[in-house]
Amino acid sequence: KLATDAIAALPGAGRVTVNVTQKITAHAVQRGVKLVPGVKNIVAVASGKGGVGKSTTAVNLALALAAEGAKVGILDADIYGPSQPTMLGISGRPESVDGKTIEPMEAYGIQAMSIGFLIDVDTPMVWRGPMVTQALEQLLKDTRWRDLDYLIVDMPPGTGDIQLTLSQKVPVTGAVIVTTPQDIALIDARKGLKMFEKVGVPIVGIVENMSIHVCSKCGHAEHIFGTGGAETMCKDYDVPFLGSLPLDIRIREQADSGRPTVVADPDGKVAEMYREIARKTAVAVARKAEDFSAKFPSIVIQNT
């Protein structure tokens, strides 16, 4: 719109039509890890501790990227506590056409996969670490993702087996860290950031959730968890600050009802915040080195 208005204002300009196209390419990942078929870029959404709104941020980030025109999927990597089926309002079981792969579920224009689609809601996952990591690999690689620009991975909190598996065996383009301004959350967020750095996964940026609370009755605004913590962390580690989100009861209500904020209130202020975070995430990914591994032929050396 800005480009159209600027050109139309020039003397002698008639009717102006501006067509904008985009091309999203695959970007470099950890050494020795191959790309997943049908997926160009994998972005992990992680947090150092639970309860900071990571899953809500992940699903709204995925939906916001889709709203910007990208082809997006979301993988629920929280094997012990999957929440994406509820947040996306999806029920039922995924299908398998060939008996080897499974078709992703779909909602609001994005593809989705979760262990929650394969078990009953009340069934606990009493699994040890190796079984959990194997399940994650199968969910990722046995799902027939269809030409995704971005696959958002909703990580479990902490720095355990799943995080290690993801960083060693899954081609991650970058990680988004979600935290609150609270000192305890920031301490754990720093640990998560350092873990990704140690295993060679670049940090796309940090999102500060619950940064401010606005009373739904009187409109009073208050920083109940502190202020400025995530921005300070970004400066300390020289990583981008992607944005802040409010502590708003509607975000929780919309996610619980199976209609996350970006689709429940697309013209609202909070939805625009999510879209701005999505745009910054896309820009940060685009600035990373492209992956050219598929463009080169395989070289085989044989002794004859």
Predicted segments with their positions:
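Short, non-transmembrane amphipathic alpha-helical segments
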Residues: 1-17
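Residue-level signature of catalytic and energy-coupling elements of molecular machines
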Residues: 7, 39, 50, 76, ...
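Conserved catalytic-core segment of NTP-binding enzymes
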Residues: 33-34, 149-150, 156-257
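Phosphate-binding P-loop
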Residues: 34-40
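Walker A/P-loop phosphate-binding motif and the immediately C-terminal alpha-helix
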Residues: 42-78, 193
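Phosphate-binding loop that captures ATP/GTP phosphates
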Residues: 65-127, 133-141
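C-terminal boundary of histidine-terminating zinc-finger modules
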Residues: 257-272
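A short, charged, Gly/Pro-tolerant segment at domain boundaries
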Residues: 277-280, 290-304
